[in-house]
Every structure is written in C-alpha cells, then in structure tokens.
C-alpha cells in the first residue's frame, strides 16, 4: 500500500492563495493519479472503506484545484445509494461532482463519509468548503464525468478504490 502522497502539482499559487493554504492544517492525502489514455485514473486508499471513499472524492477535487486553498466556510451534505459498492462509489462521486459543476459550484477542502451501510448500499457524507472562484482558487483540469470503466473497490484489510474520471 502506498504511503501518504505529497501534492506535487504546480498551480503557480499567488501569495494570497499561499496564505490561505498556510492558515489551515494540511488534509491527509492518501491518493494518487495514474496515467490512463485520454482520462485520469484515481487510486485512493484508507484505513477504512469510508476513508478510501473520502480520499477518492478529494482526489477528484484535487485534480480540479489545489484544495489547500479552499477555506471551510460552508457545509454541504451528500446522501446517496447504490446497488453494490461500485455503484455506491459512482453515485457518491457523481453527487459531489454535481455539487461542484451544476449546483452550487461548491469545492470542498475536506469530505468526510459519516456512514456506509454495506447491507443496503447507502452512504452519508459531509463536506466543508466554499464556492469555487477563479479569483481565489487555481484552476486545474475540469472533471466532466465519473465512469464505471475499470472501477474497482477492494474492501479488505487495507481498503482501496480505483476510478477513471473523464476529463
């Protein structure tokens, strides 16, 4: 299992963005980006399945901006369900992407999965962040959609997930 990753993406942060980033403690980063033809594969892991899902959501948002520049000014909740763990992960990420792209332009600094009901495949989560603003947050690459292509959920001793996102 990989260790916590250091964010090496260069966003050419302004002094104001660096100041916001320094204002809050860094959020644990247990994810990486894997090369994939024309898309990006997210690989996230955690001590629990909940943490692996959280990290996958943060990997998705981390591809769109430096989440360290986001201030936890608002709270957004997402509840979703699926037919199995893969569809639950898909709908979880899709709902968070909707909060960003179509609904509130909400970008989280942190996402926390409050519970996963693995019997009925339901999930409750919460995120702390703010409305995305180009004047405040560096622009990464837009995530257009979540895909089922090569999606994997390993719910074992060291849970990990793999998801391809369409960019």
From Swiss-Prot:
Positions binding Ca(2+) in this chain are: 39, 166-167
Q: Which family does it belong to?
A: Belongs to the archease family.
Q: What does this protein do?
A: Component of the tRNA-splicing ligase complex required to facilitate the enzymatic turnover of catalytic subunit RTCB. Together with DDX1, acts by facilitating the guanylylation of RTCB, a key intermediate step in tRNA ligation.
Gene Ontology terms describing biological process? tRNA splicing, via endonucleolytic cleavage and ligation
Outcome of substituting residue 144 to A: Abolishes ability to activate tRNA ligase activity of RTCB
Indicate where the modification N-acetylalanine is found in the sequence. Answer: 2
UniProt xrefs under Pfam families: Archease
Q: How does it assemble?
A: Component of the tRNA-splicing ligase complex.
Gene3D superfamilies on file:
Archease domain
Q: Which PANTHER family match?
A: ARCHEASE (PTHR12682), PROTEIN ARCHEASE (PTHR12682:SF11)
This entry carries the following GO cellular component terms, namely: cytoplasm; nucleoplasm; nucleus; tRNA-splicing ligase complex
Write down what this protein is called: Protein archease
List keywords of the entry alphabetically: Acetylation, Calcium, Metal-binding, tRNA processing
Q: Which domain of life is it from?
A: Eukaryota
* Disulfide bond positions: none
* Gene Ontology molecular-function annotations: metal ion binding
Species in which this protein is naturally found:
Homo sapiens (Human)
């Amino acid at each position: 299992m990989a260790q916590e990753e250091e964010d090496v993406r260069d966003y050419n942060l302004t002094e104001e963005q660096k100041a916001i980033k320094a204002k809050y403690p860094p959020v644990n980063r247990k994810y990486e980006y894997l090369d994939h033809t024309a898309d990006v594969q997210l690989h996230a892991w955690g001590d629990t399945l909940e943490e692996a899902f959280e990290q996958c959501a943060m990997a998705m948002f981390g591809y769109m901006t430096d989440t360290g520049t986001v201030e936890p000014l608002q709270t957004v909740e997402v509840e979703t369900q699926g037919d199995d763990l893969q569809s639950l992960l898909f709908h979880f990420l899709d709902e968070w992407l909707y909060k960003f792209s179509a609904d509130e332009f909400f970008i989280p600094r942190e996402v926390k999965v409050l519970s996963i009901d693995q019997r009925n495949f339901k999930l409750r989560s919460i995120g702390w962040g703010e409305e995305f603003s180009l004047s405040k947050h560096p622009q990464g690459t837009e995530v257009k959609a979540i895909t089922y292509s090569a999606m994997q959920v390993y719910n074992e001793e060291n849970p990990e997930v793999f998801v391809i996102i369409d960019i």
